[in-house]
A protein has these predicted regions:
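N-terminal secretory/targeting leader peptides
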Residues: 14-105, 123, 128-323
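A gly/proline- and charged-residue-enriched helix-loop-helix capping module
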Residues: 102-121
Length: 323
């Protein structure tokens, strides 16, 4: 009898269930990729791990989910990285370190300097970054034409909404824009009523879907990107065998690169939709964007002084200044 039980127990053992938290709507590409990842992890671990996807912030917003991952009550996430837990994490949102899709693949390869550095800050908190989701590049959406958009030394003549983060405020100034902080829900009305002329911080798709009726120009300056991290609770990670950990890492790397290819296609799709709507779209090569990248690099020192640390930003510049 004992022998019979021992023989069947491995085959009937219940799988380890991972709750995978997302912040995007159910029909969003980020959620679709989460579902594809869940399927491939389930298959790759031969059913030993069952990943269940919870989109649309069902398990909480990104800050709460980070807290839950630290506790081990949420296993993994595809969400914004909460910088509240360590100001050094804000390097992720620095402007100008990648201005194109090939550069993004180099910067966000899980074995590259930036993901490894981010893990130096996240692992002590109890969270591991295993990959990245790049939704799309960020440009300038404007109701008025910008003066010399590729020359950072020229005042653009645009009062520009920026997210309330040092990296965006400092970056906008270096690019020649006059920054003003306006809450995200109020940007449309602010542009409609002339409180501001332009908006910084919107990826291409969001600029079209949210601001498409109030903008006349889109400058694809690619100085930043909409970023989500594939993160795993360290407590949950330690429940996995080395073999199953490798499955997670391989799948996360695959979907990091896949997200960047998708971002390129989505950015172009929405720029074409802008053009059909009558919005003037300016596309640029990475070579044309080099002056903007160099201008944004001047803002990195300010990010260091604001809490990230000047030595860290020097290291950041060394590794990402010429990518």
């Amino acid at each position: 009898m004992f022998l019979f039980v021992a023989m069947i127990s491995p085959a009937t053992a219940a799988p380890t269930v991972f709750r995978f938290a997302g912040q995007s709507p159910p029909d969003h590409m980020a959620t679709k990729m989460m579902e594809q990842m869940a399927k491939e992890i389930n298959e790759g671990t031969k059913g030993r791990v069952e990943v269940k996807v919870y989109p649309a912030s069902q398990l909480g917003n990104y800050t709460l989910v980070m807290e839950e991952m630290i506790r081990g009550t949420v296993d993994m996430a595809c969400m914004s990285v909460a910088t509240d837990f360590d100001p050094r994490l804000e390097i992720l949102y620095a402007n100008g370190y990648v201005t194109g899709y090939d550069a993004a693949k180099k910067a966000f390869d899980p074995d590259a300097w930036l993901p490894k550095k981010l893990n130096e800050f996240l692992t002590p908190l109890g969270v591991r970054l295993i990959g990245s989701y790049i939704e799309g590049f960020i440009g300038i959406a404007s109701a008025k034409e910008a003066k010399a958009p590729l020359d950072p030394k020229v005042d653009k003549g645009l009062l520009t909404r920026v997210p309330n983060m040092v990296c965006y405020t400092a970056g906008a100034k270096e690019m020649g824009y006059r920054p003003i902080t306006i809450p995200y829900p109020d940007v449309y009305q602010s542009m409609q009523t002339g409180v501001c002329d332009a908006a910084d911080g919107y990826p291409t798709a969001a600029a079209y879907t949210i601001l498409g009726d109030v903008i006349k120009y889109w400058y694809a300056t690619n100085y930043s990107m909409e970023y989500l991290g594939y993160m795993v609770s360290d407590k949950s990670w330690k429940k996995l065998s080395p073999e199953d950990q490798k499955v997670f890492l391989d799948v996360a790397k695959k979907y990091t690169l896949k997200s960047i290819d998708n971002a390129k296609a989505e950015d172009e799709k929405y720029m074409q939709l802008m053009e059909k709507k009558g919005i003037k779209v300016y596309r640029y090569t990475e070579e044309q964007l080099r002056p903007i990248k160099e201008a944004c690099m001047n803002s990195w020192e300010e990010i260091g002084k604001a809490g990230a640390g000047t030595e860290l930003m020097k290291e950041f510049k060394q590794h990402l200044g010429n990518i």
